Structure formats: structure tokens, C-alpha cells
Amino acid sequence: SDVLLDPDDVVRRHLLSMTPPLQSVCSTPYAFSLQIANSYLKNKDVIIDDDDDSGNIKIGDSILPLINFESGRFGGYQNIDAQGYQIMLNYRSYYNPNEFIERLTLTDFLESEVNMNLEDRIVLVGVTADSAGDFWDTPYNSGQADNRMPGVILQAHLISQLLSFGLDDRPLISALPDWSSSSMVWSTCLGWGLLFG
């Protein structure tokens, strides 16, 4: 479950698959999030397919908008690690992104103090304690160390993104083509020039 960091150490991209290094302990090319989503979606008769001749990954009938670095650029990205199949990460929008899922402590689980209605749900087991050291900067925390996202919550966002795309047609983030970015800059300059020139 590799995580891609942008130059400012913020997680904005979602790595779906890549060819593992020869000496890697983990030989699967697929991300943990993709494998969990695939297992869940199979029960909903939604298939994840990467055998498409174009090299795209499909969830059901929809193609994931993979980041295309062939031109060396993708939106604001230039000259970054472009290995594997990547999409932009569309976080769940909540006041506190660490609280978008139901969380149980191990004690609550063992003492059965909670309603154990786990049918048709994905359960991730992980550590959210500060001592775990598995925390990530996201666009939500803006460099504030005390608001970093635990790795297990980050995985929940990754899985949720794939499930919502496959089941609810939730749109994903993509970039405008290079030509449209240039057109927008020129249009803005022309507009400002006409208004204030």
C-alpha cells in the first residue's frame, strides 16, 4: 500500500498499481485499496478490470481517469514520479476528515459495547495512536502536525473513493488539457486588460 507524496509531502494522488521491484517482499502489483474495493464490489456484481487494451482500469462500465504524464505534465504537476497507474485522490469532504467513518476501539469491540452490525461493511483494523508513527499530511491539515491523518484513515479514503466511483458514479478529480490551461490564462489576461487597461 505505497503512498505517493507530492513535493510538499502532501498525499494528493492515489496509486492503484505498479510493477513491484524484483526484491520486493510484496509481489502483488495492486494497491491494498484496489484489492479491498475489488473484493467488496464483486459482491455487488461490479467488476474491476485492467485487461483493457488501452491499459486503463475500469470499474463497472466507467474508466478511471488515470493521470497521464506522457506530455511530462498533468495540471500543475511537472516532472514528478509517474510510475504505475495513478489517479487524483478525491477525499471525502467532512469538517474533520479523520471522522468520516465509524471507529471502534479494541476495548469496545472486545467488550461488545457497540452494535455489531458489520454486515455489508468493510472493516479496517489499524492503529491511530500517536506512537504508531503512521501519519500523513493531506490537503486538510495544511502542515499542522497535530492534524495529520492516520494511515488506516487514509486507506479508508482511498477505498471509499473507488467504491463511490463504482457504485454511485461519484466524479473523480482530473486536470484540464494543456491547451485549455493556456487558453484560460490568455482569456484571464485579456479580460483583466479590457477591464482595467
Predicted features and spans:
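Flexible inter-domain connectors and hinge/loop segments
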Residues: S1-G193
